[in-house]
UniProtKB/Swiss-Prot annotation:
It comes from Halothermothrix orenii (strain H 168 / OCM 544 / DSM 9562). This is Large ribosomal subunit protein bL12. Forms part of the ribosomal stalk which helps the ribosome interact with GTP-bound translation factors. Is thus essential for accurate translation. GO terms for biological process: translation. Homodimer. Part of the ribosomal stalk of the 50S ribosomal subunit. Forms a multimeric L10(L12)X complex, where L10 forms an elongated spine to which 2 to 4 L12 dimers bind in a sequential fashion. Binds GTP-bound translation factors. The gene is rplL.
Length: 123
């Protein structure tokens, strides 16, 4: 019997038949189909969940690398700064290039800066 055939058989069962099936499976395998009880939130654990759900990122220029001019060009492109301001920003590395951007935009900026020879971190 294939998985598809099993799924089809389950789809054709009534609610009562499904409840009996669940009971028999629980007995046969010694398990419980009951949902696990939610535990009280531990303050330390909450921080880990917030990190996973982070929606805004800072693009941090850690090191310029050997191609400073290329890095300045990319910084100008992604920030809209003029040449003088972009050069000053690159000269101040390590520093944030852009703050509070979406994950997609942050990844794109990181990729461009790394292609230009810089070392970049997302924070």
């Amino acid at each position: 019997m294939t998985k598809e055939e099993i799924i089809e058989a389950i789809e054709n069962m009534t609610v009562l038949e499904l409840a009996e099936l669940v009971e028999e499976l629980e007995e046969k395998f010694g398990v419980s189909a009951a949902a696990p009880v939610a535990m009280a939130a531990v303050p330390g654990a909450q921080g880990g969940e917030q990190q996973e759900e982070k929606t805004e990122f800072d693009v941090h220029l850690a090191e310029i690398g050997g191609k400073k001019i290329n890095v300045i060009k990319v910084v100008r492109e992604v920030t809209g700064l003029g040449l003088k301001d972009a050069k000053a920003l690159v000269d101040d590395a390590p520093t944030n290039v852009k703050e509070g951007v979406s994950k997609e935009e942050a990844e794109e900026i990181k990729s461009k800066l790394e292609d230009a020879g810089a070392t970049v971190e997302l924070k």
